[in-house]
Amino acid sequence: MKKNYYLLLICFCAGFNVVAAQDTPAELTSFKEKVDRAIIKFEDTNKQLWSYNISRYENEEGDISSSIEQHLPQANEPWLLKQINGQPATHKQIKKFAKKQQQTRNIQFKLRELINQESLSVVSANEKFIIMTFNVFMKKLGKDSIGKLQGKLIYQKEQQFIQQISIWNNAAFTPMFTANITDLAITFSFVNINGAILAKQNEMKMKGSFAYFTEINETSLDSFSDYVYQGKQDALTN
């Protein structure tokens, strides 16, 4: 059963050794400024100038589906459905997919809305990474989720970008009438290619109930690969 109101994407980041950071006011201000510049770098990346592939996997209550999509910005139809459930996409499926992409192409992922910068707090830092937590409110999850979602980001110092964002709930919440979410975990991973900040992987895990009797048990994983810049090279390097 499709639940389009939950198409978010997630996963928890793998653990690694860090040294506890001294959360002094000066350090906190400095780290917040780094995060803000990283968000600007993400905002300045024009994703429409890149070709890439997306491999999608979904498991909804045991109903498994997969697809491979391709983005070609210079083509007449920039989005192409290549495979669905391991088989080449039919003409009908390709046409339906292209129409759907036209309807949703203006929907953009906004880090600035996701990360509450005022609430940023340092968890730890070392010579490679800064880990910070923040408050989360996602409009699509409804007002009942306020105060029940937490976020964590990993800032990569050398390349100066946000490498990963994790979101999870600390209490059950109701995103819409008759739906109850007990477990939610989302992860957005990014890659830095010549200064452009692009999606690497999105994963979501969610459990709960719908209409009191229907179980919600979903996993989705989107993997992005084969990035090739299709714009002017001086625009990428400047």
Q: Model-found features: residue ranges?
A:
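Structured extracytoplasmic
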Residues: 22-147, 169-175, 179, 209-238
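Beta-strand-dense domains in secreted/periplasmic systems and polymorphic toxin scaffolds
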Residues: 165, 200-202
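Extended lipid/amphipathic-ligand handling interfaces
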Residues: 153, 185-194
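Long, charged/polar, surface-exposed segments that mediate recognition or autoinhibition
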Residues: 148-149, 156-170
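Hydrophobic residues embedded in beta-strands of well-ordered beta-sheets
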Residues: 78, 130, 160-162, 197
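Sec/Tat signal peptide C-region and signal peptidase I cleavage site
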Residues: 16-21
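Subset-of-secretome marker
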Residues: 183-184, 206-208
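Sec-dependent N-terminal signal peptides
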Residues: 4-14
